[in-house]
Amino acid sequence: MFLTNGSRAGPVKERGLLIIDADHPNYDASGRGKRRRVEQEHHSDLNNETAAPTGGSAGEEIVLPFTKTLASWKEFESDEVYKRTPQRPHFPSLAYTHPSFGEPTAAYLTAAFIDCVKTVDGMCEDTPKSELDVYRETFKMFEEQGFDVAEPLSQVLTLLVLRKMRRESLRQQKGMEKEMADDYSKLKKSLVRCKSSFEDKETAK
């Protein structure tokens, strides 16, 4: 390429393109033309841009849709629930949320998750089925955010199964009690008839 003063120039950058003159030593004479494009690298500051969250297995980096700045994250990570089952939530639902709302929402969800796990730890077979159903659906929601819900969800499902088994056992027990009561009633009536028949025979003598 020639400059306006007539002197021959080396590589010249124009609008993101690297233009090399045919006579320049770096000219690519492979038949692809006198110009070749060189992709420019652009580096973005991840702290200033919202990145789409990606989950991963242990050892892989997780990109969050916000920057952690709240002190509460250290409290969450030191909690017994996190120590028992390490958590790596990535909050995909917050990918397109404004950063100023994303982190507080994620912190709220994390605190709620810890509370739910501790609540389930204290549940028993007497817990109402309606309450167990609510927690079952809640943990499914947490799972969509990247939380490991295998343990608490298993506890909820186990309690639901135990409640069903106990309800079935009670139903069978009531059925047996009713059957025994019916048999006893029939036997009692039969004894009454036998006694009456015996008395009639004695009277006839």
UniProtKB/Swiss-Prot annotation:
Keywords per UniProt: Growth regulation, Nucleus, Transport
Superkingdom is: Eukaryota
Signal peptide as annotated in the record? none
Q: What does this protein do?
A: May be involved in the polar growth of plant cells via transportation of RNAs.
Summary of the knockout phenotype: No visible phenotype under normal growth conditions.
Q: Name one Pfam family in it.
A: DUF724
Provide the protein name: DUF724 domain-containing protein 4
UniProt cross-references to InterPro entries, sorted A to Z: DUF724 (IPR007930)
- Report the residue ranges that make up the DUF724 domain in this protein: 63-189
Q: What is its main location?
A: nucleus
On tissue specificity, the annotation reads:
Expressed in roots, leaves, stems, flowers and siliques.
Organism lineage reads as: Eukaryota, Viridiplantae, Streptophyta, Embryophyta, Tracheophyta
Q: Where is this region: Disordered?
A: 28-59
Cellular localisation: Nucleus
- Source organism (scientific name): Arabidopsis thaliana
Q: Which GO terms describe its cellular component?
A: nucleus
